[in-house]
Design a protein with these regions (language model features):
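Short alpha-helical catalytic segment bearing the HExxH-like zincin motif
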Residues: 1
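Interfacial and helix-entry/exit segments of alpha-helical transmembrane bundles
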Residues: 5-88, 92, 109-129
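Cytoplasmic/organellar membrane-interface segments at the starts of transmembrane helices
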Residues: 37-39, 93-167
């Protein structure tokens, strides 16, 4: 959930920066901005790849743990989740291609300014965290492990208590 929070917030910030500059929500209003906004294109790529679950990003850690758990419990659910991941990845790649690498058809896009200092600090800080937790996930997992063990213990006690009340 930490990874999802970082990546989702960062993607919304990237879209917000684009909207602030272009004032349009239509994908067709964009295209070919990689040469005009290289810093934004870079951080957008990092967050998009994190959302896809690319190894080396925090998104990979979350997705692989969820899929491994799903395969242990229900093969059908795991397959459905995997299909959802594939469709999500296809959409994200399509979106990135159209917005960032598409053909530059609108002359007014050439006047856009790349990230300012404060936008850059926020977005690059989030990018560093997404990459850092992708390579060092145990900083989060070890901390969460204690809480999860306690939650499981309480859940098991509640089940035992419930079963004893039913008898």
């Amino acid at each position: 959930m930490i990874s999802h929070g970082l990546i989702s917030a960062a993607l919304f910030l990237c879209v917000g920066v684009l909207y602030d500059r272009v004032q349009s929500r239509l994908i067709s209003s964009y295209g070919g901005i990689v040469n005009i906004l290289p810093k934004l294109s870079l951080v957008f790529a990092i967050f998009m790849l994190g959302a896809l679950g690319l190894p080396g990003t925090s998104g990979f850690v979350g997705e692989i743990l969820i899929l491994l758990g799903a395969f242990q419990k229900s093969f059908l659910v795991a397959i459905l989740a995997s299909i959802g991941i594939i469709f999500g990845a296809a959409y994200m790649l399509w979106l990135y291609k159209r917005v960032i690498f598409g053909k530059l058809e609108k002359i007014e896009l050439k006047e856009l300014k790349d990230l300012n200092f404060s936008e850059g600090i926020v977005l690059f800080s989030l990018a560093v965290l997404v990459l850092f937790f992708g390579f060092y996930p145990n900083l989060i997992l070890d901390t969460a492990h204690i809480s999860v063990e306690e939650l499981i213990k309480n859940y098991e006690q509640a089940i035992i208590l419930n079963q004893s009340m039913v008898k």
